[in-house]
């Protein structure tokens, strides 16, 4: 199995994929500092066109996905306030085995979200 980190975003308020969500992948380094590894935007299926991280760049450690959902909700008219309740959703996770597929989906609505380790 080739290791990689992937995600997808579903908008549970309308039951559709969330297109146009900016997703950042950060590595948490010594002292708790964050290092931006990559940034991508979800496509019409709410998925990314390629993995955020692949086997040759994977390393054991702590990572954080940051989903820029506030801009998505504003752009699509789901909220009508300058400062949406959910703006950036951070999901911090541990990566132990560089040969595994780490899929971290986000189910989101303007008032809440959930995530899980997918396959």
Swiss-Prot record:
Binding site for substrate: 8, 47, 116
Enzyme class, spelled out: hydrolase
UniProt entry keywords in alphabetical sequence: Hydrolase, Purine metabolism
Enzyme Commission number: 3.5.2.17
GO molecular function per UniProt: hydroxyisourate hydrolase activity
Reaction(s) catalysed by this chain's protein: 5-hydroxyisourate + H2O = 5-hydroxy-2-oxo-4-ureido-2,5-dihydro-1H-imidazole-5-carboxylate + H(+)
Top-level taxon of the source organism: Bacteria
Protein family: Belongs to the transthyretin family. 5-hydroxyisourate hydrolase subfamily.
Function in brief: Catalyzes the hydrolysis of 5-hydroxyisourate (HIU) to 2-oxo-4-hydroxy-4-carboxy-5-ureidoimidazoline (OHCU).
Other comments on record: HIU hydrolysis also occurs spontaneously, but more slowly.
Name of this protein: 5-hydroxyisourate hydrolase
Organism expressing this protein natively: Halalkalibacterium halodurans (strain ATCC BAA-125 / DSM 18197 / FERM 7344 / JCM 9153 / C-125)
Phylogenetic lineage: Bacteria, Bacillati, Bacillota, Bacilli, Bacillales
């Amino acid at each position: 199995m080739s290791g990689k980190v992937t995600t997808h975003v579903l908008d549970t308020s309308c039951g559709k994929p969330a297109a146009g969500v900016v997703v950042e992948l950060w590595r948490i380094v010594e002292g708790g500092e964050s290092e931006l590894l990559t940034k991508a935007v979800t496509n019409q299926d709410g998925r990314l066109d390629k993995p955020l991280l692949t086997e040759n760049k994977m390393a054991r450690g702590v990572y954080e996905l940051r989903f820029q959902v506030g801009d998505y909700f504003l752009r699509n008219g789901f909220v009508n306030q300058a400062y949406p309740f959910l703006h950036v959703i951070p999901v911090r996770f541990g990566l132990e085995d560089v040969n595994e597929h780490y899929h971290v989906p986000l189910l989101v609505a303007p008032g809440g979200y959930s995530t899980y380790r997918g396959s």
